[in-house]
């Protein structure tokens, strides 16, 4: 489960997209 509260107020769907972009800088986004 991804923490939507981590700067992702748009929702889990957008969160996944953000994670893909933050994966390299956000290891916790996994």
From Swiss-Prot:
Superkingdom of the organism of origin: Viruses
UniProt KW keywords: Acetylation, Activator, AIDS, Apoptosis, Host cytoplasm, Host nucleus, Host-virus interaction, Metal-binding, Methylation, Phosphoprotein, RNA-binding, Secreted, Transcription, Transcription regulation, Ubl conjugation, Zinc
Residue ranges, compositional bias (Basic and acidic residues): 13-30
UniProt PTM comment: Acetylation by EP300, CREBBP, GCN5L2/GCN5 and PCAF regulates the transactivation activity of Tat. In addition, the non-acetylated Tat's N-terminus can also interact with PCAF. Phosphorylated by EIF2AK2 on serine and threonine residues adjacent to the basic region important for TAR RNA binding and function. Phosphorylation of Tat by EIF2AK2 is dependent on the prior activation of EIF2AK2 by dsRNA.
GO cellular component: extracellular region; host cell cytoplasm; host cell nucleolus
Sequence motif: Cell attachment site, positions: 6-8
Residue ranges that the Swiss-Prot or TrEMBL entry lists as coiled coil: none
Compartments in which it is found: Host nucleus, Host nucleolus; Host cytoplasm; Secreted
Main location: host cell
Record region (Disordered): 1-30
MF GO annotations: metal ion binding; RNA binding
Other remarks on this protein: HIV-1 lineages are divided in three main groups, M (for Major), O (for Outlier), and N (for New, or Non-M, Non-O). The vast majority of strains found worldwide belong to the group M. Group O seems to be endemic to and largely confined to Cameroon and neighboring countries in West Central Africa, where these viruses represent a small minority of HIV-1 strains. The group N is represented by a limited number of isolates from Cameroonian persons. The group M is further subdivided in 9 clades or subtypes (A to D, F to H, J and K).
Family: Belongs to the lentiviruses Tat family.
Assembly and oligomerization: Interacts with host CCNT1. Associates with the P-TEFb complex composed at least of Tat, P-TEFb (CDK9 and CCNT1), TAR RNA, RNA Pol II. Recruits the HATs CREBBP, TAF1/TFIID, EP300, PCAF and GCN5L2. Interacts with host KAT5/Tip60; this interaction targets the latter to degradation. Interacts with the host deacetylase SIRT1. Interacts with host capping enzyme RNGTT; this interaction stimulates RNGTT. Binds to host KDR, and to the host integrins ITGAV/ITGB3 and ITGA5/ITGB1. Interacts with host KPNB1/importin beta-1 without previous binding to KPNA1/importin alpha-1. Interacts with EIF2AK2.
Protein role: Transcriptional activator that increases RNA Pol II processivity, thereby increasing the level of full-length viral transcripts. Recognizes a hairpin structure at the 5'-LTR of the nascent viral mRNAs referred to as the transactivation responsive RNA element (TAR) and recruits the cyclin T1-CDK9 complex (P-TEFb complex) that will in turn hyperphosphorylate the RNA polymerase II to allow efficient elongation. The CDK9 component of P-TEFb and other Tat-activated kinases hyperphosphorylate the C-terminus of RNA Pol II that becomes stabilized and much more processive.
Domain notes: The transactivation domain mediates the interaction with CCNT1, GCN5L2, and MDM2.
Protein name as catalogued: Protein Tat
């Amino acid at each position: 489960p991804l923490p939507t509260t981590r700067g992702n107020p748009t929702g889990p769907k957008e969160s996944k997209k953000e994670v893909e972009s933050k994966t390299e800088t956000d290891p916790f986004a996994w």
